[in-house]
Amino acid sequence: MKVLCISKWAKARPSPEERDAILPKEVPATLKLYLDGVIEQMWFKLDAPGVVFLVNAESVDAAKIHVHGLPMGQAGLMDFDFIPVGPLAPLGMLIAEK
């Protein structure tokens, strides 16, 4: 299944010192999930600080484990909203049956 994972700060925005201490761990951990095929796509949010991941997982709970396992999640700095997504099923009504 595919799950949209939309980040938000779990508490007040981290200080520059907190951010600078964790980013050297966050980036490689995120890239590993991408290279492992867990994160299919990733975007930077334009309306607020944060990211959006399209995650391949067996369930929403599995997606939660993956993204909360990232260093910012483990440090309690980042939380996510999780939205399971799939094919646009109503389009099937537009296909003529023979």
Regions found by a protein language model. Name each.
Residues 1-98:
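Conserved, structured core segments of small domains
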